[in-house]
Swiss-Prot record:
An example Gene Ontology molecular-function term: ribonuclease P activity
The organism's taxonomic lineage, starting at the top: Bacteria, Bacillati, Cyanobacteriota, Cyanophyceae, Synechococcales
UniProt protein name: Ribonuclease P protein component
Superkingdom to which the source organism belongs: Bacteria
GO biological process: tRNA 5'-leader removal
UniProt-listed Enzyme Commission number(s): 3.1.26.5
Role description: RNaseP catalyzes the removal of the 5'-leader sequence from pre-tRNA to produce the mature 5'-terminus. It can also cleave other RNA substrates such as 4.5S RNA. The protein component plays an auxiliary but essential role in vivo by binding to the 5'-leader sequence and broadening the substrate specificity of the ribozyme.
GO cellular component: ribonuclease P complex
Family assignment from sequence similarity: Belongs to the RnpA family.
Swiss-Prot/TrEMBL catalytic activity: Endonucleolytic cleavage of RNA, removing 5'-extranucleotides from tRNA precursor
Keywords: Endonuclease, Hydrolase, Nuclease, RNA-binding, tRNA processing
Source organism per UniProt: Prochlorococcus marinus (strain AS9601)
Quaternary structure annotation from Swiss-Prot or TrEMBL: Consists of a catalytic RNA component (M1 or rnpB) and a protein subunit.
Gene from which this protein is expressed: rnpA
Top-tier EC class: hydrolase
Entry keyword tRNA processing: yes
Length: 128
């Protein structure tokens, strides 16, 4: 199941803001960029819901896999984890999260991918 629209990050201005104003957390398989939310940037993209909630974007480059099917599977795995653990996410401080998967062969090892994703969520204090 996909992430709800009010939890998605879109637009180049949003990503530029995250790259400039974020804390970066590195893992072996992925990096997290966590920034304070800024709803004013969302207004420039004509989004109807500009609430100050937790939002996320998952970016998987072609270096990870040339096949879009495999990249989408990885994205769906991470989105599924987010949706099942949404109650654990720290909502009293609104953040934007950008997840970048690094180059590596982890397509066959779903548990390793999810373990590192959860560890980085704890490390970035998005989950208590």
């Amino acid at each position: 199941m996909a992430i709800p629209k009010d939890m998605r990050l879109k637009g180049h201005r949003t990503f530029n803001y995250i790259h400039k104003n974020s804390m970066t957390y590195h893992g072996k398989l992925m990096t997290f960029k966590v920034a304070r939310s800024n709803p004013e940037i969302l207004l420039t993209h004509k989004l109807t819901n500009t609430s100050n909630n937790f939002r996320v974007a998952i970016a998987i480059s072609k270096k990870v896999s040339k096949k879009a099917v495999e990249r989408n599977k990885l994205r769906r795995i991470l989105q599924e984890w987010l949706l099942t653990n949404i109650q654990k996410i720290n909502n009293h401080k609104p953040y934007w999260l950008l997840v970048n998967l690094k180059f590596g062969d982890f397509r066959n090892d779903k548990s390793k991918l999810l373990e590192e994703f959860q560890n980085l969520m704890f490390k970035s204090r998005l989950i208590k």
